[in-house]
UniProtKB/Swiss-Prot annotation:
Subunit comment: Homodimer.
Record-linked InterPro entries: Phytyl_CoA_dOase-like
Gene: lolE2
Induction details: Expression is induced in loline alkaloid-producing cultures as well as in planta.
Coiled coil: none
GO aspect biological process, one term: alkaloid metabolic process
Record's protein name: Dioxygenase lolE2
EC number: 1.14.11.-
An example molecular function term from Gene Ontology annotations: metal ion binding
């Protein structure tokens, strides 16, 4: 990976070395500096949680578990919430990521993952296959809005797996043979912490077995500066091939 070229006060040489070796980095709020008031972030997320099924705007995705219809994710939200747009695509996150990777980048996916009580987990997988037709390489920031614990289904990583090219089976999961002997490490986070990782990290999630939400804000960034409009193309494609609950009344004018 390219050495860092844009120093950030919260990212040390040891952090860069850890990220390169392990494929992820945890930073507390006082180190990353993406926002100065956790309570404000939580208010922003509370506002978005009340958004309805308006059409042609943000995208709400739901899951059904144990007979309950639960909000799972809200995507394409930046246009409709200025503070969240700055948090995800402003100078601060881009400077932080450049200090870690040495690369400039552009956001192409923005969302909140809600992980409500009873929310489902996810089998071991990589994020790369889901987005590779748009961005073969990318990096993600996950900002913990609530505490992330083993009990409420925090992310679990296999450190260093980004270097191993984990094989993917026909159903999109990591091949079972590769998983033998691998240890998944829980990414326990305090509210306000960030977790940064790349497209090739092997990870899984357990269900949320508590009575508390485990929300996080996500920004996903690609490195091809010649495609500043990739986000528009991505969401036009996603509207057709992975439509949200409020998609049936959206007007789709883009080509797949």
């Amino acid at each position: 990976m390219t050495a860092a070229s844009s120093p950030h006060p919260g990212v040390s040489a040891e952090d860069i070395e850890f990220y390169q070796a392990n494929g992820y980095l945890r930073l507390p709020q006082e180190a990353h500096g993406l926002f100065d008031d956790l309570a404000k972030l939580q208010v922003w997320v509370a506002e978005i949680s009340q958004w309805g099924l308006e059409t042609g705007k943000w995208r709400h995705y739901y899951e059904t578990t144990n007979g309950k219809h639960l909000l799972w994710g809200t995507e394409k939200l930046m246009e409709y919430h200025a503070p969240m747009q700055d948090l995800i695509s402003g100078e601060a996150p881009l400077a932080l990521l450049k200090s870690l990777t040495g690369k400039d980048m552009v956001v192409f996916k923005d969302e909140i993952g809600w992980k409500l009580p009873g929310g489902k987990g996810a089998v071991p997988h990589l994020d790369r296959p889901a987005y590779s037709m748009f961005a073969p390489e990318f990096i993600e920031i996950m900002i913990a809005v609530d505490a992330h614990t083993v009990e409420n289904g925090c992310l679990q990583f296999v450190p260093g797996s980004h270097k191993e090219a984990a094989p993917i089976s026909a159903d999109g999961r990591i091949a079972s043979a590769w998983l033998e002997g691998k240890e998944f490490i829980p990414m326990v986070l305090d509210p306000g912490d960030v977790l940064i990782f790349n497209e090739s990290m092997a990870h899984r999630l357990e269900p949320n077995k508590t009575d508390q939400r485990r929300a996080a804000v996500f920004g996903t960034y690609h490195f091809d500066l010649s495609q500043p409009d990739l986000r528009d193309k991505f969401y036009a494609h996603r509207l057709i091939h992975s439509p949200p609950e409020n998609a049936w009344v959206e007007k789709v004018g883009a080509q797949t």
